Swiss-Prot record:
It comes from Anaplasma phagocytophilum (strain HZ). GO terms for molecular function: ATP binding; dTMP kinase activity. The keyword Nucleotide-binding applies. Keywords: ATP-binding, Kinase, Nucleotide biosynthesis, Nucleotide-binding, Transferase. It catalyses: dTMP + ATP = dTDP + ADP. ATP binds at residues 7-14. InterPro entries: P-loop_NTPase (IPR027417), Thymidylate_kin-like_dom (IPR039430), Thymidylate_kin_CS (IPR018095), Thymidylate_kinase (IPR018094). Phosphorylation of dTMP to form dTDP in both de novo and salvage pathways of dTTP synthesis. The gene is tmk. GO terms for biological process: dTDP biosynthetic process; dTTP biosynthetic process; dUDP biosynthetic process. GO terms for cellular component: cytosol. This is Thymidylate kinase.
């Protein structure tokens, strides 16, 4: 099963992907769960990621940026994701296809049809389930700044956030929109309440997936 976490910088998706990977590892065994991230996931991609983040003051051409992310996604898919899925493992990714659609498509204005076609060429599959974490932009950016993320204009993040919301609306068969406002205590999002919601939503889906995988194994 291929599970992805999406959302704007600072939304908490990385925390949720780590929590879910720990939960799944305890349940199914560490050897049956793969946690990865984009950009990143391989030694080559992590090197490119560090270079990309270290030159945040350098404005990369929009199409150049798109092709860089797609190249890293292809590398991660071939070296990590594809083989794990073939082995019937649970793959959890911090960002994937929808980030490209939201950031490069809705945020930067690159043609959405082009992005979808290129993503199809790069991966050929879509995630089985995607959790999109929706959060107030100012709250998210205050957290992202502390985490060292590159800052962009508020207008850019409004476009990206709306992009994620649109994706969730158009692809309800696989996307779940989790609004942080629904899980706040004293103005702070309770990460464990969000985690418990995710686990609850996944239980039935995972049970069916694992049963199907087991029944397909020839003895």
């Amino acid at each position: 099963m291929f599970i992805t976490f999406e959302g704007i910088d600072g939304c908490g998706k990385t925390t949720q992907s780590i929590l879910l990977a720990k939960y799944m590892s305890d349940l199914y065994g560490e050897d049956n769960v793969v946690l990865t991230r984009e950009p990143g996931g391989t030694s080559f991609n992590e090197l490119l990621r560090s270079v990309f983040l270290s030159v945040s003051d350098y404005k990369v051409d929009k199409l150049t940026e798109l092709f860089l992310f797609l190249a890293m996604r292809r590398e991660s898919f071939v070296k990590v994701v594809e083989s794990a899925l073939r082995a019937n493992k649970i793959v959890i990714s911090d960002r994937c296809v929808d980030s490209t659609v939201a950031y490069q498509g809705y945020g930067c204005g690159i043609d959405l049809d082009l992005i979808y076609k290129l993503n199809s060429l790069v991966m050929g599959i879509v995630p089985d389930m995607t959790f999109i974490i929706d959060i107030d932009i100012e709250k998210a950016l205050s957290r992202a700044t502390r985490n060292g993320y590159e800052s962009n204009s508020m207008d850019f993040y409004h476009k990206v956030r709306k992009g994620f919301q649109r994706i969730a609306e158009e692809e309800k068969h696989r996307c779940v929109l989790l609004r942080c406002d629904d899980y706040e205590e004293n103005g702070i999002c309770d990460v464990y309440s969000v985690h418990n919601k995710i686990v609850g939503l996944l239980q039935g889906v995972l049970h069916n997936k694992m049963d199907a995988a087991s029944s397909s194994v020839k003895v």
